[in-house]
């Protein structure tokens, strides 16, 4: 498997030893979590943003990815538009508001970025078929994405989803050729079912089990810099598993490492009031979020009670001097429908949380008035229009 010049292997976050790219099940020395590492001195900003980095999709940033674009399993994920939201700019009273519309990825979700990296790594194994089946638990979007990218390699995949998962996710997991198990209950039940129901060994595509899913999320940071010519001041990120916060924060830090920028922006994790383990841990000064005992959010994508990347997300927020806010479901859904009405972009319910978080900041007078603000829309509104429409009907519209 060809690897990029700057990639220095998978480093163990516990003992520091370095393992090859195709290591499975954590650090061979101590079992710790593995993280892609790079020789940053070998990367020039021009490698990322100059003429050689031209192309479509996030693989144009392969100078800071483990594998070259020529090896990528890709459907041109990334290169999503940064849409100026003029009404929101006026209403929030800031310099500029942009929506980074991740709904326009191949399967309509930001998770396509990481899945493309994870499956590219699988393709580089000596015998990818020996890894079958690939499996993960998902609230919906990542399961759909996994089925799509695994299908590209012709590998069998299982997505375990809770029964509440959106119909579009369930249907398209099968349409992409993936196998699906619908598990009664909530997301933790689906997560437990992977081990309970799969009789064989499997290759885990779970976030943070593979070192590559949150790694793929970091290209959001690179694209924001490429499109704005500078970093934004504040980025609102809907938060569930922690992989987006951890990944995007790493992307901002790497831009400092290679000398493209001097400082990182403020990153804000937004969670539902009724399921906010990462926000609660951040507010209480805990390193590791406690599982959320009684989740009750309409937004299934954000109902992750015991996030696999919870500690990583909290750590990233602290490193970047970030913030965390919680928002009511009605505000998230109301924000998503307001954006659809006035800004054209179809935000999913989870994406609406980013807009609701920005409104919360506005109401708390937390903006100074000249910021460039980015709202990350993590999913297409076309995935669950019923949830959005129900919200309007509930208001008599
Ligand atoms: Zn180790």
Describe every region a protein language model picked out.
Residues 1-397:
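PLP-dependent amino-acid enzyme catalytic core
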């Amino acid at each position: 498997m060809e690897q990029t010049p700057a990639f220095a292997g998978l480093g163990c976050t516990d003992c520091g030893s370095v393992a090859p790219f195709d290591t499975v099940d954590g650090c061979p020395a101590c079992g710790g979590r593995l993280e892609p590492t790079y020789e940053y001195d070998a990367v020039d900003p021009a490698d990322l943003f100059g003429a050689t980095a031209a192309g479509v999709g996030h693989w144009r940033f392969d100078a800071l990815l483990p594998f070259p674009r020529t090896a990528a399993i890709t459907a041109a994920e990334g290169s999503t538009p940064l849409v100026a939201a003029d009404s929101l700019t006026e209403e929030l009273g800031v310099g500029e508001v942009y929506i980074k519309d991740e709904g326009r990825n191949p399967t309509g979700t930001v998770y396509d970025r990481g899945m493309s990296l994870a499956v590219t790594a699988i393709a580089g194994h000596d015998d990818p078929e020996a890894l079958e089946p690939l499996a993960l638990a998902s609230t919906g979007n990542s399961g759909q994405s996994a089925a799509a990218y695994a299908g590209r390699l012709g590998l069998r995949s299982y997505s375990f989803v809770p029964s509440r998962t959106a119909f579009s996710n369930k249907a398209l997991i099968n349409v992409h050729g993936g196998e699906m198990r619908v598990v009664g209950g909530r997301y933790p039940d689906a997560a437990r079912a992977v081990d309970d129901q799969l009789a064989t060994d499997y290759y885990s595509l779970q976030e943070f089990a593979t070192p590559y899913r949150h790694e793929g999320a970091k290209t959001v940071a690179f694209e924001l810099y490429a499109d704005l010519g500078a970093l934004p001041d504040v980025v609102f990120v809907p938060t569930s598993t922690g992989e987006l916060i951890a990944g995007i924060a790493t992307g901002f830090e790497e831009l400092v490492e290679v000398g493209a920028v001097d400082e990182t922006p403020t990153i804000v994790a937004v969670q539902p009031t009724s399921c906010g383990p990462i926000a609660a841990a951040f507010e209480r000064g805990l390193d590791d979020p406690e599982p959320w005992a009684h989740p009750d959010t309409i937004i299934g994508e954000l109902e992750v009670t015991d996030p696999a990347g919870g500690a990583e997300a909290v750590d990233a927020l602290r490193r970047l001097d970030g913030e965390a806010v919680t928002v009511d479901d009605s505000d998230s859904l109301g924000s998503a429908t307001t954006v659809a009405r006035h800004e054209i972009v179809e935000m999913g319910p989870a994406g609406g949380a980013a807009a609701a978080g920005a409104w919360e900041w506005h109401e708390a007078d937390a903006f100074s008035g000249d910021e460039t603000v980015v709202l990350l829309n993590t999913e297409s509104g076309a995935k669950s229009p019923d949830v959005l429409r129900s919200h309007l009907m509930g208001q008599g519209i």
